[in-house]
Regions:
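Flavin-dependent oxidoreductase catalytic cores
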Residues: 1-387, 391, 395-407, 415, ...
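Short gly/ser/thr-rich secondary-structure transition/capping motifs
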Residues: 1-7, 36, 366-370, 447-454, ...
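Active-site acidic short loop of glycosyltransferases
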Residues: 208, 290-291, 464, 502, ...
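Short loop/edge segments at beta-strand edges and connector loops
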Residues: 297, 436, 452-455, 490-492, ...
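Rossmann-like dinucleotide-binding cores of NAD(P)H-dependent redox enzymes
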Residues: 409-449, 520-566, 622-624
Length: 642
């Protein structure tokens, strides 16, 4: 594979063309140094075979932002420890150098003085206006901070500096955000002056280090719109790329511009952007420069990464490496089909970062927990029965088998997948099935036995030592008058294609299942009304998918009733109590069919006579059904305890 060939970048060589791009992780210590969680995360990527690893958002001064920081000699050792670990595993390490879009000193002073309200107001103001208010003298001071950071990185043994071409640097370059009238505003030459000055000074101060530049490109959206603000449109990016090469940049990292407040622009979720949506842009840049070009953006599989050849020299895999840090090693060993591929849900990664939690992946229980979650051989090999072949049962089987247990999965239906078989049916959700295909590939290799169409019964007890129960949940029904009428069905039965509805359909419940079912039915010609007790629908949906979802509902003329409680169902309508401005009115909504999507209840088999140790995982464990993240983690942990 071309993907696995070495490549010369500046004065160093990457062992392959697989890059872990800069991502905010939330793992760093309070002072921004590399602590144990951060160290183990990046070390795991290096052990997995990644050729080039970049630490995202490294600030060159003390800020209150939850990002890595490198501004003091006391922090060098933590970065050196990581650089050494990367080198021991054949990887090169880079840091992404950036400056926040705000006046760091002013905000730090406000926070230290306890002026929280003023600080929040200042931050909000600066995020909109700092690019135009920061003085030329302050910009020069910022470059000095960045030079100091680069010197410290060099002392730590870091190989590369990636200039973050978004954030402050990208705002200055941007024709959309930059409204300055001095030497840093106006035409392209002025807007890129700071970036080029920074690059030249970095080349002077750390001549032995590779200089990478993240080149964010503003892309078209519809007829007159655009995605991203903190970057350049393609025509200007092409000119700027050649100027960056002339200034001494060793490699360019082509990416979608950000700075819109919607992380779905640079990190699009399932079905919201084509696969490899930035590859055509990297191809144009590559045609203009002689230095290596990397590209990032919805490149999911080894085959897709290999297909980038000719359009970019290096492939950046962010979410894909969170899902499977052994991506490179599996490719090198000829086991591409065993790569666990990202389903682009953005739940554990992008949403977590936006919610000020740390980076993780819902499909990889070890991600972010590399120190505490490791698969080790079992003390005693046992015969394990797993009841249920949903994603929790499948993950438990994988982990238990890797630990040396003999695993048999009982599944009463004739196919594996559980709830993901229906969760993948609504528009844009088919990518979820990749997670099931992964288990179809790896479990037979681990000698896991499947008993499809069979239930676990008393006659099986003597054949096993312990049992993992992963029987999931079932669709709940609201106990209102009329709930047993033939026009009433469940969202799960609709998505499983067990029931067909038409005409006017009322979907009871505006959670994620209800809203996705509504979109699914509207796309098939139904006139749909969503009835939700709360004041908002789809609260569980990723913020990177929600705008697309709401736009599709509006386009399909789906009616939405919030703060509305179902009280009765009759043969031709649902009766709803709608509360607005503390006043409640009764509405009758014509309905040919009523679809219940009001949550789930645990599905617990009767195992009272089973003498074996029982371990409950996934939706059938805990107080109430949960989500994929809980299913995977509970399965992993249970399998590691046996």
């Amino acid at each position: 594979m071309k993907l696995l060939e070495p490549i010369k970048v500046g004065n160093i060589e990457f062992k392959n063309r697989i890059m872990f791009p800069p991502l905010t992780t939330g793992y760093e210590e309070k002072d921004g140094s590399i602590g144990e969680q951060s160290f183990r995360f990046y070390e795991r990527l290096a052990k997995g075979g990644v050729g080039y690893i970049v630490i995202g958002d490294v600030a060159p001064l003390s800020t209150f932002s939850p990002t890595p920081k490198l501004y003091s000699p006391e922090q060098v050792q933590s970065f050196k420890r990581l650089a050494d670990a990367c080198h021991e595993n054949g990887a090169k390490l880079g840091i992404q150098l950036f400056h926040p879009d705000y006046n760091v000193k002013a905000l730090n002073d406000m926070f230290h003085q306890g002026k929280m309200q003023e600080a929040r107001a200042k931050l909000h103001h600066d995020m909109q206006h700092f690019v135009n208010e920061v003085t030329a003298e302050e910009l020069d001071e910022i470059i000095k901070h960045m030079e100091n950071c680069a010197i410290l990185a060099h002392e730590a043994g870091v190989d590369c500096i990636e200039v973050h071409g978004d954030r402050l640097v990208g705002s200055l370059c941007s024709p959309i955000l930059n409204h300055r009238t001095d030497e840093y505003g106006g035409d392209l030459a002025n807007r890129t002056r700071f970036a080029l000055t920074l690059v030249k000074r970095l080349k002077t101060i750390v001549p032995d280090m590779v200089i990478d530049y993240k080149l964010p490109i503003v892309t078209p959206l519809g007829d007159n719109g655009f995605r991203g603000k903190g970057g350049l449109p393609l025509d200007e990016a092409c000119i700027f790329a050649k100027e960056l090469e002339a200034a001494g940049v060793d490699t360019l990292h082509v990416a979608q511009a950000n700075h819109t407040g919607n992380m779905g622009d640079p990190i699009p979720a399932m079905g919201t952007q084509p696969y490899g949506f930035m590859v055509s842009y990297s191809k144009k840049i590559k045609e203009l420069v002689s230095i290596p070009v990397s590209v990032v953006g919805r490149i999911v599989t080894p085959e897709a990464a290999e297909a980038v050849n000719g359009s970019a020299d290096i492939v950046a895999l962010g979410r894909s490496l969170l899902t499977d840090p052994d991506f490179a090693n599996k490719c090198a060993d000829g086991h591409c089909c065993d790569v666990r591929t990202c389903m682009m849900c953005n739940k554990g990664c992008t949403d977590n970062i936006q919610n000020r939690a740390f980076l993780s992946c819902v499909l990889n229980a070890e991600n972010g927990y590399e120190t505490s979650r490791q698969i080790t051989p079992a003390v005693t090999a046992k015969r394990i029965a797993i009841i249920g072949a949903g994603i929790a049962g499948l993950e438990a089987a994988r982990v238990a088998a890797l630990r040396g247990h003999q695993v048999t999965i009982f599944e009463k239906s004739l196919q594996i997948g559980g709830q993901l078989l229906i969760a993948s049916v609504p528009p844009r959700k088919e990518e979820m099935m990749r997670s099931i295909n992964y288990y179809l590939n790896v479990l037979p290799e681990l000698s896991v036995t499947f008993r499809l169409g069979q239930e676990f019964t008393g006659k099986d007890y003597d054949s096993f030592d312990e049992v993992i129960v992963a029987t999931g949940a079932t669709n709940a029904i609201i106990p209102v008058p009329g709930k047993d009428l033939p026009i009433v069905t469940s969202a799960w039965d609709i998505l499983a294609k067990k029931e067909i509805v038409f005409g006017n359909v009322s979907v009871i419940g505006g959670g994620l299942v209800g809203v996705e079912t509504a979109e699914y039915l509207a796309a098939r010609g139904c006139n749909v009304t969503i009835i939700e007790m709360m004041d908002q629908i789809a609260k569980e949906e990723s913020s990177t998918i929600l705008p697309t979802l709401m736009s599709e509902l509006e386009h399909s003329n789906v009616q939405i009733l919030t703060s509305a409680k179902l009280s009765e169902i009759n043969d031709h309508a649902v009766i709803v109590e709608k509360t607005e401005n503390e006043k409640t009115s009764v509405l009758e909504i014509r309905s040919d069919f009523v679809v219940m999507a009001v949550g789930a209840r645990k599905n617990l088999p009767d195992l009272s006579a089973c003498p074996l140790p029982l371990h409950y995982i996934g939706d059938c464990a805990g107080e109430r059904p949960s989500n994929i993240d809980h299913a995977i983690k509970s399965a992993y942990d249970a399998a590691c305890e046996i």
